[in-house]
Amino acid sequence: MIEMVSRGEQAPCMTSRSSWSLGKLALWASLVPFLLLMRPYGGLFQDARIYIGRGVADLDPGGVGRDMMFAHDEQSRFSIMRAVVRSLLAVLTPAEVSMLLALAGILLWLVAAAALARSLARGRAAWAAVVCVLVLPAQYGAFGVFSYAEAIATPRIFAEAAVLGGLAALLSGHRLRGLMLLGAAMGFHPLMALPGLGVAALLLVRDDRRWLIPLGAACATILAAAALRLPLFDRLLVPMDTAWLTILRRAEYLFPSRWPAAVLSTFAYRLAAVAVAGSLSAPRVGAFLWGTAGVAVLGTLASLLFGDIVPSVLITQLQLWRWLWLLGLVGNASMALAAIGLWRRGPAGHFTLSLLALTFLSSAAPSLSMVLAAATVAWHVADLRGASPILSRRVVVVAASAAVAVAIADLWCDGAALSLLVRSAEAQGGPITWAQISSVGLQTIPLVAAAVASALIPWRMVPSSARFAGAASLAAALVAGILLWDSRTTERLSIEHRDGAAELRTLIGDTPGEILWIDEQSEAWFFAARPAFFNAVQGGPILFSRELAVQWADRAATLLRLHLVRPEDVAPWADPSRRSDELVVRPAAVRAFCADPSHPAAVVAPGEQLAAAPPGWTVNLWRPPAPTRRFFVDGAGLYWRTIGVFTVIRCLPSEAVQSPAPHA
């Protein structure tokens, strides 16, 4: 059994402060280098643009605030993040707010994750569990859209921290503290808090069946509110209309029926790890682990049935499949707990451990991974019941050798991928960041193996020289983490510092209106201080606003017809590869775009495309202080597209624009 604190059903982390020695403090502090290295900061990008952009829009209602995404915002009112960002923007720049929130978020998350780990196991077993949580794949759902513990300025990271802290408190017997933290999670991000509430409900009912009364009353109240058509709750019984659903289908990650089979591999190893670790833990911990898996499975099935096949507006918007985030974290922690517990069970446990390792390593073959997961659980259950056959040493060695061989092959593939990345970057002048290097995953297997081994080897058996080497390595890792955590490129730094922004705004002119920045990544908001006519970021919140979805889709159709965006800019999940060539803008397309009833102000096109301006229109070239470099997976290769100059075309007043239909 995994080493637990023996105190009945009480919290394994209930230890006195005096028990904290300098060694224990150093052990847990050593997680900081892992955090900094495994969660590098990429800048104001991804969903941070939504939340920081919301704050910028609040402070600039006549400018960025007119952007259609903020004008039809139905998302931010459910989170206190909007107020937090707006307050910080009063004294800091958007870039500074983004970095501050990202750093604060992951540090709070680490503290909460450590607290939860100490409620599941103790000592180095708990430490190894957190290491596995940090280094094993953190993605949940499909297409790598979401991960837990993201170092970006979103409310998700704070909600995750509050959920983990709340569950740790509940497992420790601190019920009020736990419920308060779960309430804080709801305040930051209700969707991320829901699985925590589900697991908390299971723990409370397990302790006292009388909790079924208030929980049942809460469910009945929700159903009654839906039946009475009260605001928000009425969406539960409203089917999503075809037009809105068709627009949303472009975001395939929202709908489990459209997920690739590779998702099953991740699901399989995490469920197998939870099943094994739960059986080796104290009853309360086992109930927590299995409850987490059950909540995740229930949420995914509900999302498939009522948010996908027969979609209800509310269930679709709740994205119940996102309950997988908690299973992802707990499943990765369970990999360490299961490995430690299985190793201590002798040959039969070693054989089960080999099967579990092969389940994880066979992620490229979903069918095989699922079979191995089932075999892992079946063999382990038989072993626990004493029904498994006695294995010869040769069988155990063969299974372990197979796992080691596959691990070596996996490392070789990761090394080849890293080599390809470096060689492609050198050949094309593309920037290489630590975030890109760490995302290859070359470090995953060695770090997991080292963490589990360190938890198994008695400390007294570790030579002093090895202890010194380990301490020196961690110190070096801390220095490296501090230096490498800020993984922003020169281009990203230039954009966030708004270098050259004044010159660009002069070229755009004073005419109010939206701008179309082709291939933009929210530069219109943070660089040009303008509302964007269209960008991919605006396509994220369309799930929460039908008006935004329709307007965004109409504009996407217009730009596709004018060849001012690519199909993959509108539906990136249909084909993850992207073309590395630049869009060629034509005068007829510019003229037709500028005739749009929304009265756009300008077009910013990549490259030197002076011929794109209709005769007599104002056109200029703008060179950013740092060239823009875009990374693409195009066909069979990796490519960087470097853009050193942009073409800025001012739109004429709408009454002066004639817009014949452009030829394809």
Functional labels for PLM-detected ranges:
Residues 20-24, 31-110, 116-133, 141-159, ...:
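Active-site lumenal/periplasmic loops and adjacent helix-entry segments of GT-C-fold
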Residues 1-34, 456-475:
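Start-transfer (signal-anchor) and selected internal transmembrane alpha helices
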Residues 299, 351-507, 512-521, 538:
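Transmembrane helical bundles and short interhelical boundary loops of multi-pass, membrane-embedded
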Residues 576, 582-664:
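Aromatic/acidic, Gly/Pro-rich catalytic loop(s) in extracytoplasmic/lumenal soluble domains
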Residues 14, 158-177:
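Membrane-interface transmembrane helices that cradle and orient dolichyl/undecaprenyl
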Residues 412, 483-496, 505-576, 580-583, ...:
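Short periplasmic/luminal acceptor-recognition loop of GT-C membrane glycosyltransferases, typified by
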Residues 35-52, 59-77, 190, 194-196, ...:
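Transmembrane catalytic cores of multi-pass membrane glycosyltransferases
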Residues 167-169, 176-190, 196-203, 219-221, ...:
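Membrane-interface alpha helices of multi-pass inner-membrane proteins
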